[in-house]
């Protein structure tokens, strides 16, 4: 077993270009530090815009309120999808790439000026897209399916953003070469950096598909070429779904990092974790096919091979990480004396540390809700009763929003003191923020999925079809489900608002702290930085359980609970499918 975050030897620090972190001992290249800050701030701005649009959509889909008119609803829905799933997530991931290649490897980054060019290109692209959407020139939803036509500048903005992100990935790879050549670390890449490499490789594949989608779409929008709608859909989902798999790889990397920072989590088996990351690279993009399961232009064989065989290899990777991360946390706790009973390590965990609580909630909601629903609705036969219902956004709000965003939020509470060198403002609010956000999103996702089970459509302004020549009556329970969903969403929005408040205030108006204040554990500094987890010894390993459930018996029990929940949900959906086609 190895620690998740191993500290390489720190080379001599000279000049103003570098500084050494007093907590981790890592050398920080100041240009990389500034680029991390810029991308993190841009991500927070995108989160604010996307969060406001989310509230407007929520209060419209809640039939009792029905806030927006149809034109504005689809405009806001377009902005919400692009801003949250593309701009917020990818800006933050760019910050993660700079962190994983620079500070974690004690390396300088390649071509800092190129980094600023990339950031400027991404920012210009994002602003261009937002302007086109909010001025009513791109009411085409996030997918912008052909033949819906937006202003050419909309497509150009996305191309700018994608090219900037692609260049950051190449800059990341170049930094790895520099670190290897200058021997800033020993042995193989740290696991967190290896996960970031996985995310960057998937990003390159994804962004190349984006170029194959949006460059022709731009030419089509100015009338130079024609496009086939089915080909566009296939290429777009190679971008749209794969972009969320960048999130998965980045999220899992952050899980390992937060585990190490908060409780000194260990890595059970480096080869196993790295193999799981490789499975992501090889198979996760093929899961994009589950968005095309009802499209008549693709054969059943193609659909089944991609979603019922290749996709399961990526699912296997997630399940491996879903075991190794909590097991690493459990063993890390037990090695440090918290070994009473099956779940004594849970009771003694630092639940007041927002970094740790974000980690746990991210793993739980992503696995138990997002993961189980994703595999189920990706099955060809079951998908026929799920496609275009509320069950689809119910799934990805549990994965991207509750899983990925929670991991990013948890990491932020450590980046503020480590990178910005400031206390986390409004510490009490920061401590409850993960519970509000995750709890609200859990209710939101579950009840949205329940409503989808009654056939409530996604992306629809008015499910009552008012003034239509026909009437669609839903089960009376739908109104109650949508009401509870809305309340959960509002609680999550409150949690998201607190995160933005804490982050913005800390970064721009926060107080710097001294080394004495850190050691004294003043408010606003996470526990993992006040009392870093002590190094373990061979004697500590002798205290680990050796029973039939191994060194992590608590995690083994939780895994069995997960598998039981998975089986019940999966086979219940086959039972529901039988109600669609009655025989006899």
Protein language model annotation of sequence segments:
Residues 4, 537, 575-576:
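Acidic/proline-rich low-complexity IDRs
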Residues 82, 245, 558, 562, ...:
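A generic structural micro-environment signature
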Residues 360, 439, 557-573:
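Final/C-terminal transmembrane alpha-helix of multipass membrane proteins
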Residues 531-549:
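Short, charged N-terminal extramembrane segments
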């Amino acid at each position: 077993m190895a620690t998740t975050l191993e500290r390489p030897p720190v080379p001599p620090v000279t000049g103003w270009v570098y500084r050494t972190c007093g907590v981790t001992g890592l050398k920080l290249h100041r240009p990389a530090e500034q680029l991390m800050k810029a991308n993190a701030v841009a991500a927070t701005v995108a989160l604010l815009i996307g969060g406001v649009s989310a509230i407007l959509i929520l209060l419209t889909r809640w039939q009792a309120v029905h806030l927006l008119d149809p034109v504005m609803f689809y405009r806001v829905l377009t902005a919400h999808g692009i801003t949250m799933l593309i701009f917020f997530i990818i800006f933050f991931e760019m910050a993660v790439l700079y962190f994983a290649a620079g500070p974690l490897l004690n390396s300088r980054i390649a071509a800092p000026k190129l980094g600023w060019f990339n950031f400027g290109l991404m920012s210009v692209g994002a602003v261009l897209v937002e302007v086109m959407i909010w001025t009513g020139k791109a009411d085409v939803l996030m997918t912008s399916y052909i033949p819906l036509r937006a202003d050419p500048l909309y497509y150009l903005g996305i191309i700018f953003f994608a090219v900037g992100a692609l260049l950051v990935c190449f800059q990341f790879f170049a930094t790895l070469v520099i670190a290897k050549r200058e021997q800033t670390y020993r042995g193989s890449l740290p696991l967190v950096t290896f996960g970031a490499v996985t995310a960057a490789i998937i990003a390159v594949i994804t962004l190349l598909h984006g170029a194959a989608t949006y460059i022709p779409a731009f030419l089509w929008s100015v009338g130079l070429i024609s496009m086939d709608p089915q080909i566009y859909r296939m290429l777009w989902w190679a971008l749209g779904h794969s972009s969320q798999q960048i999130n998965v790889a980045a999220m899992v990397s952050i899980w390992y990092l937060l585990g190490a920072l908060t409780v000194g989590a260990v890595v059970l088996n480096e080869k196993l974790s790295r193999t799981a990351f490789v499975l992501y690279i090889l198979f996760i993009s093929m899961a994009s096919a589950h968005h095309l399961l009802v499209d008549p232009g693709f054969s059943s064989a193609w659909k089944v091979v991609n979603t019922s065989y290749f996709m399961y290899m990526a699912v296997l990777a997630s399940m491996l990480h879903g075991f190794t991360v909590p097991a690493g946390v459990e063993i890390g706790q037990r090695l440090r004396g918290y070994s009473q009973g099956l779940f004594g390590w849970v009771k003694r965990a630092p639940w007041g540390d927002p970094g740790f609580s974000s980690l746990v909630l991210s793993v739980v909601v992503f696995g138990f809700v997002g993961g189980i629903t994703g595999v189920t609705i990706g099955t060809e036969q079951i998908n026929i009763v799920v496609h275009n219902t509320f069950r689809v956004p119910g799934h990805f709000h549990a994965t991207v929003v509750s899983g990925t965003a929670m991991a990013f939020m948890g990491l932020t509470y450590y980046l503020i003191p480590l990178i910005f060198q400031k206390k986390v403002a409004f510490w009490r609010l920061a401590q409850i923020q993960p519970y509000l956000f995750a709890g609200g999103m859990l209710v939101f996702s579950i009840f949205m999925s329940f409503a989808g089970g009654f056939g409530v459509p996604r992306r629809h302004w008015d499910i009552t079809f008012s003034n239509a020549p026909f009437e669609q009556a839903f089960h009376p329970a739908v109104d109650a489900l949508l009401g509870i969903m809305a309340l959960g969403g509002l609680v999550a929005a409150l949690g998201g608002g607190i995160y933005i408040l804490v982050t913005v205030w800390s970064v721009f108006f926060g107080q710097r702290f001294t080394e004495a204040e850190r050691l004294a554990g003043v408010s606003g500094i996470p526990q993992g930085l006040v009392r870093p987890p002590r190094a373990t010894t061979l004697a500590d390993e002798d205290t680990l359980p050796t029973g039939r459930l191994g060194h992590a018996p608590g995690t083994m029990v939780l895994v069995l609970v997960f598998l039981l929940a998975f089986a019940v949900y999966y086979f219940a959906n086959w039972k529901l499918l039988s109600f669609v086609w009655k025989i006899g």
